[in-house]
Amino acid sequence: MVVAEQLEDVFVGGYLVIYASQDGAGEEYRLPKEVVARALPVEPGRVPVNINHDASCRVGSVISIVDVEKGLFFLGVVSGSLALAMFKYVARDLFRADDGDSPGGGAESETRSDEALPANTLSEREKFLYLLSNVLPSLSLSSARLADGYSPADDFFAHVALCELGKRDGTIAIYGSSPPEVLDAFSGLDDAAKRELARSAEEWTTSSRREEPVDEAMVSECLLRKFMNNAFLMDRGEYLRARRHLADVRRPKYLQAAETTCLSSANPRSSGKAAFSCEARGLDEAGAGAIGRAPESGMAASADQHAQDGIKIRLERSRSQIGPGAMSSVSQPAAAPYSGAMADSAAQVPSAQPPRIPCPPTGQTEMIYVPLGTYNDLVVSAAQARRGEDRRQQLSAPPPQHAQQIVQRETGINSSSPALAPAGRGSYASASHIMHQPAFQTQQPCWPQQQQYVQAPCGGHGIGYYGQAVSRRGGSSGDGAPTTRSTGAPGAGGLSMFGMQHAGPQTHFTAPLHGLPTGFPAHGSFLHAPGYLGAMPPIQVYAPQPQQHPPSLDTRIEALLAALEKERASEQGAAEGPQQSLVAGQNKKKALLKRSMEHQREEEEDDESAPEAPYFPGEAAASCKRQAKRQRAAAEGEEQVAPSFSDLIQGLAALHKDVAEMKASVAGIGAPQASQPTPVAQPEHEEPKQAPATVDASSSKKLKDSRRAAEKRRAADEFARIMSTE
């Protein structure tokens, strides 16, 4: 590509240093704000602008450098003669932006190389700005090395280099045809700094100063050296995007952010090689066409549209330009590699993705921008479709080996043979239950000859594991036997087998079933396959029940007292008003709190005292106590802290003792004491020794329960002794 004449100078601007982001470059590249302030201002034109820090390749000058709150910002000028050296290596059709419907557009424009381009193409200056923005997108400042005792002077700034990626973060270069076009790209730059830079640029322009022509041989050498040094640079676009964000550059006009270097919609080279196609992202053209709309005129996006954040996707020019036979040649999606009997039905199950539309011929493609959010939705949809295929592959797997072993061990029936397969929960699915089950309905429409397989809800009947997958065939079954269609199903019909259920009209199914009687073909076609599973009676499974112990007398008395107390409390609450009920509830809460505190205090006291006889785990007495305690808690609704039955017995025993002492004292005062007869020795009868009582010493709470039971027994023995003396 050759430029007829030298272009006018263009402007460049950007941050040379961002004060808050200097850690990544290293300490030797750190520039403190106070040091920079002593080196300013800079005389316009004194600091040169070169390529890759090559002093012999000067291409412009620095107009002004200002110190703002965010960092050190500069505005410079680049010589228009640099375009002559760069355009020598640019293809002629790189910047073509023809209108496909215009006389100069489309395929005809490829043969008109000597004629003038249409009026809607980019100007030479805009092409030059695109080249600079994409070939030299960054800035790098060269300054004097800071040392102890060094004071910045007029020669502190050596030069500003245009490069691929600078050492410092946020040093992005923005090019423009005028100073406002450069400065407006930085949203974080304050108005005062913009006015100062614009005034300096106006003074530079009014002075009619122009940059000297560049050395084309030196420029070519520098650009080749730059290419060789940066050929292995990884993630260049990510670095530039991060630096634009750090520099508050929101909408760069000439910075090409896409992964293709071509701006043309009718470029044959870009459509075949450099164009970013849908297949590179795992999507097809139909997925992109669902969100993008081809312009009616087929014209490529303008320079302003290229500045938006998005992803280029190759689309058809328009449906009217594809031709009548293109849509008829739509290829069906390839079936997933299913295994077993599921492979035949997988090809007829509708895919989650839309039909695949073939790519249009070369020269009839165009690039559009797709919003990142919509593109992410496409990626998620493709991932969900892949997960659905993986799920269907998992469902097509045979039942696990351990399931067959469990079935054979529990029932004595080999599930691999053509006998009855066991159902879940220890029973067989009856024919009457299966035939009266309603079909499982799905929200997706049932297309003709294409049915949806869905997961059936878990119930009490049905096969207890996933068996062989269900497939649908036409013609004959897998073993060559003629297939038939069952019409005796009620309603719409449904298939419920092996944990799967099919919704839809009467449909031809062929499936290898484990649950058929002996002699029935292994492969068959029926609408309600589980209806054949009702020949065997249900298998009863008996689970061991825990041993029940009758509650003791104390437990029944305490439960009766608690029930009477609750009934009395409910009657009082019904008789009282709402306010009195509220007060009673509060008093009850206080009483429960006080009782729990006393219970906790008693537990602490019980922890200090040892039980009378230890309890060894495994004895029957402890299980009886635990069972009685659980029954008492279930009957009362809450744990009883201190029963009142033992207190009544102790009080009654003390009363009888006092009465006996009073009688003895009265008899001693009123009558003389009689001589006591000598006791006659009676033969002692040895009573059978009782087994020592045991208590549960596993916790303080159990110790407390044992202590209470011992107190009750002592009180009962004392009461019996008193009653016997009377």
Swiss-Prot record:
Swiss-Prot/TrEMBL keywords: Host cytoplasm, Host nucleus, Hydrolase, Phosphoprotein, Protease, Serine protease, Viral capsid assembly, Viral release from host cell
Q: Is Hydrolase one of the keywords UniProt gives this record?
A: yes
Give the compositionally biased regions (Basic and acidic residues): 702-720
GO MF term set: identical protein binding; serine-type endopeptidase activity
Which intervals of the chain are annotated as region Interaction with major capsid protein? 706-726
**Region of interest (Disordered), ranges:** 321-362, 385-427, 472-492, 568-644, 668-726
Listed under GO biological process in this entry are: nuclear capsid assembly; proteolysis; viral release from host cell
Domain remark text: Region of interaction between pPR and pAP is called Amino conserved domain (ACD). The region of interaction with major capsid protein is called carboxyl conserved domain (CCD).
| Family (UniProt) | Belongs to the herpesviridae capsid scaffolding protein family.
What's the protein called, per UniProt?
A: Capsid scaffolding protein
Its source organism is: Psittacid herpesvirus 1 (isolate Amazon parrot/-/97-0001/1997)
Upper taxonomic classification of the species?
Viruses, Duplodnaviria, Heunggongvirae, Peploviricota, Herviviricetes
